[in-house]
């Protein structure tokens, strides 16, 4: 009898506990309300009971989100994520909450966390692609869309209509209509469009169609003729008049992307006449030819400084005439190469050899030079808008002088580019490291120069390459190492004018190892320049104003230049 009474009591106790648990555990009721999307009732049910499971946090968080209680929804879903860190539902829904509050950066982080849990989740990939698309980062949007076989593009349109030949523009786009647009197709198309050299600014956009597919819209600022208006043509041609030079330019000849660029400088110390013609080879944007001629008559006074006390190391008048031809090939989106040849003649007059100008540097006569260049993109992080690229050039030359000379110039480049903002180019950061090495005996005009000067691209921005109008005040040499860092802040953007301001830091060293005397041309020590610069764009023409300070000597430099 006692055993029977004990069994009856045990059964009664268990039934009571089950009844109480059924009354207190809201999971079943919450799930039912969730499936029926009865959000107010679900909130009322769960706000008064302890939620000890991730599922309850999920139901409650979504109900709060549907009622637009964003902050509480975020806290609840975060609690559920802590209970179930491997459940992808929580970061996806947290991304939705952040998205509704326009917190795109937070939404992207949550979706990337979800994709680390399940890289094939279609909803998360499409959601993340949509956010990047709304931010204007089409490259990253395609990266995630491509995982789910999207987007399908039906046609390519130019808005507004362009003057370039439609067939040429069509060949510049690597994509095919009625197919999925991929990241590689986008990047290859961008490389080809850039290679046409008639689009200083452009955008490739996607426009949704009613059937769920897309059209590619190409919006571009096109260079055509002397300019898009008389004012622009005048400014392009005479923008350098204060530097005693004019730069007539004619772009997109007959819609063929053939460009004719020229420069005429009448400065008595830096006379120069230059012309270049370039265009797609046989109408193929993957290939581009360039031919040109360059005539120079320059007075040089080689000295140790552009300001203050200075020692003259030598002086001369250089006359140089050259013609050149080259072919450039785009190989996909990341690689391109250039091969060319140059034939030139030089002679020197009014030479003051001083202690620096050796007979090898003053070699005269005809020269032939073979040039090769290779550029390759090493790394690309489109989410961070960060790229690292590299380049190498080789110039092998032979001079028919008495005696004859030959040389080889090698240069390498490593460049980093970062756009820290999700949109636009505000606070753009650039860093370039370049190095050069010379083998053999080079003539004077083949030496490298570290300094800011209109005919030189190896800038130390507190070392001006001219003094009293004559070149020769910047360090010269056969071997160099140069680092240029700068950042730009957008300060003004109007209809015809844009202004950027920012600091810079240049570090470099240059030396000449050919002889003891020629070593006086180099810097001997490391150079450190810092300062600020303003970059103006006026009717498509670039103007750069520079203030630089030489941290080694304390010299201040002010410089202005006009470019394309």
Language model: regions and residue ranges:
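Periplasmic polypeptide-binding modules associated with outer-membrane biogenesis and secretion
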Residues: 78-81, 96-100, 104-239, 246-250, ...
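Register position in tetratricopeptide repeats
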Residues: 35-36, 66-67, 100-101, 134
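C-terminal outer-membrane beta-barrel translocator/porin domains of Gram-negative envelope proteins
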Residues: 367-499, 503-504, 511-513, 558-562
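N-terminal leader/linker segments that initiate helical-solenoid repeat arrays
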Residues: 22-55, 59
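Gram-negative/organellar outer-membrane beta-barrel architecture
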Residues: 189-389, 452-468, 473-483, 542-564
């Amino acid at each position: 009898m006692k055993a029977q009474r004990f069994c009856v009591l045990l059964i009664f106790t268990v039934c009571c506990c089950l009844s109480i648990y059924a009354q207190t555990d809201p999971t079943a009721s919450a799930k039912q309300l969730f499936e029926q999307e009865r959000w107010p009732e679900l909130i009322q049910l769960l706000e008064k009971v302890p939620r000890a499971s991730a599922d309850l946090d999920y139901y409650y968080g979504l109900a709060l989100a549907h009622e637009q209680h964003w902050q509480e929804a975020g806290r609840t879903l975060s609690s559920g994520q802590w209970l179930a860190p491997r459940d992808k539902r929580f970061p996806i829904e947290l991304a939705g909450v952040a998205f509704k509050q326009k917190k795109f950066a937070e939404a992207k982080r949550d979706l990337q966390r979800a994709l680390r849990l399940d890289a094939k989740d279609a909803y998360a990939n499409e959601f993340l692609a949509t956010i990047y698309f709304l931010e204007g980062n089409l490259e990253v949007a395609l990266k995630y869309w491509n995982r789910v076989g999207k987007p399908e593009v039906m046609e390519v349109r130019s808005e507004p209509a362009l003057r370039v030949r439609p067939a040429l523009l069509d060949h510049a786009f690597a994509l095919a209509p009625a197919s999925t647009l991929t990241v590689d197709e986008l990047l290859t198309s961008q490389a080809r469009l850039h290679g046409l050299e008639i689009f200083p600014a452009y955008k490739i956009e996607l426009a949704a169609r009613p059937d769920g597919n897309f059209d590619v819209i190409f919006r571009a600022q096109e260079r055509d003729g002397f300019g898009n208006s008389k004012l622009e043509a005048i400014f392009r041609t005479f923008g350098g008049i204060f530097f005693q030079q004019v730069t007539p330019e004619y772009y997109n000849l007959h819609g063929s992307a053939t460009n004719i660029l020229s420069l005429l400088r009448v400065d008595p110390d830096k006379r120069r006449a230059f012309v270049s013609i370039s265009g797609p080879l046989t109408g193929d944007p993957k290939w581009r030819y360039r031919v040109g001629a360059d005539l120079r008559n320059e007075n040089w006074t080689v000295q140790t400084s552009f300001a203050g006390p200075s020692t003259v190391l030598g002086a001369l008048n250089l006359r140089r005439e050259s013609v050149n031809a080259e072919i450039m090939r785009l190989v996909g989106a990341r690689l391109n190469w250039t091969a060319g040849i140059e034939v030139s003649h030089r002679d020197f007059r009014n030479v003051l050899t001083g202690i620096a100008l050796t007979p090898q540097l003053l070699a005269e006569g005809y020269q032939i030079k073979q040039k090769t260049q290779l550029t390759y993109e090493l790394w690309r992080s489109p989410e961070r808008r960060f790229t690292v690229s590299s380049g190498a050039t080789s110039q092998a030359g032979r001079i028919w002088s008495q005696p004859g000379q030959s040389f080889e110039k090698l240069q390498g480049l490593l460049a980093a580019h970062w756009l820290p903002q999700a949109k636009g180019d505000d606070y753009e950061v650039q860093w370039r490291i370049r190095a050069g090495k010379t083998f053999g005996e080079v003539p004077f005009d083949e030496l490298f120069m570290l300094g800011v000067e209109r005919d030189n691209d190896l800038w130390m921005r507190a070392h001006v390459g001219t003094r009293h109008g004559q070149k020769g005040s910047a360090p010269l040499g056969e071997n160099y190492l140069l680092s240029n860092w700068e950042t730009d802040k957008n300060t003004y953007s109007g209809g015809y004018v844009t202004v950027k301001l920012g600091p810079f830091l240049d570090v470099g060293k240059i030396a000449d190892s050919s002889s003891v005397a020629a070593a006086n041309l180099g810097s001997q020590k490391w150079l450190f320049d810092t300062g600020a610069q303003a970059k103006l764009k006026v009717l498509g023409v670039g103007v750069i104003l520079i203030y630089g300070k030489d941290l080694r000597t304390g010299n201040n430099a002010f410089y202005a230049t006009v470019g394309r």
